[in-house]
Amino acid sequence: MSKISLDALNVRNALIEKGIETPMIDPTQAKNERRESIAKHMHEVMKLIGLDLRDDSLEETPNRLAKMFIDEIFSGMDYANFPKMTKIKNQMKVSEMVQVNDITLTSTCEHHFVTIDGKVCVAYYPKDWVIGLSKINRIVSFFAQRPQVQERLTEQLLTAFQTILETDDVAVYVKATHFCVKARGIRDTNSYTVTSAYGGVFLEDRDTRKEFLATVQK
């Protein structure tokens, strides 16, 4: 694994300690070698499906898939890509809830490698530190860019924000459509899945939790 920041290392260790890290191994090959190997195998998979890779629309698809896997939709498996964090001392003594709603979520179901599409809401009560609002979106995106199950993703986000912000007072709410349900199997186009995770005051105080949910469920 490439060199990673202290924040990334702390988050990774916290996930491992809680048993909620994505099951993955440190690759032994360089990225270029991995892209070449994936493209070679995808070429064979597509032939087995019955596609003619001599067609100019298909011939570069194995390479496109390899690049997409390594550099894009699974880039969150490499903690070297963890967002750079600039924590700001809470000198203004902000004590009200900070909440970001409707963060775009696009991830990949680890069971069938099809899309998970939804929204994420994150809230926290600052203690000693705050972070830029865009960093919240970037952290969500990082953990979405790996094969996922929604339940684990929700817990990973909770732990990541608790670790970075150095507070237990964090809430995460995820609402998503799973294309493994929508595009195959039962082919249900209407259902969605909701998961949530709470820490600190959000877990202990019902009124605080209700205040958070009142905005995300509008």
From Swiss-Prot:
GO cellular component: cytoplasm
Matching InterPro entries: GTP-CH-I_C/QueF (IPR043133), GTP-CH-I_N (IPR043134), GTP_CycHdrlase_I (IPR001474), GTP_CycHdrlase_I_CS (IPR018234), GTP_CycHdrlase_I_dom (IPR020602)
Keyword Nucleotide-binding: yes
EC number: 3.5.4.16
Residue sites binding Zn(2+) per the record: 109, 112, 180
CDD domains: GTP_cyclohydro1
SUPFAM superfamilies assigned: Tetrahydrobiopterin biosynthesis enzymes-like
Gene Ontology BP term (one): tetrahydrofolate biosynthetic process
NCBIfam families: folE, PRK09347.1-1, PRK09347.1-3
Protein name from the UniProt record: GTP cyclohydrolase 1
Native species: Haemophilus influenzae (strain ATCC 51907 / DSM 11121 / KW20 / Rd)
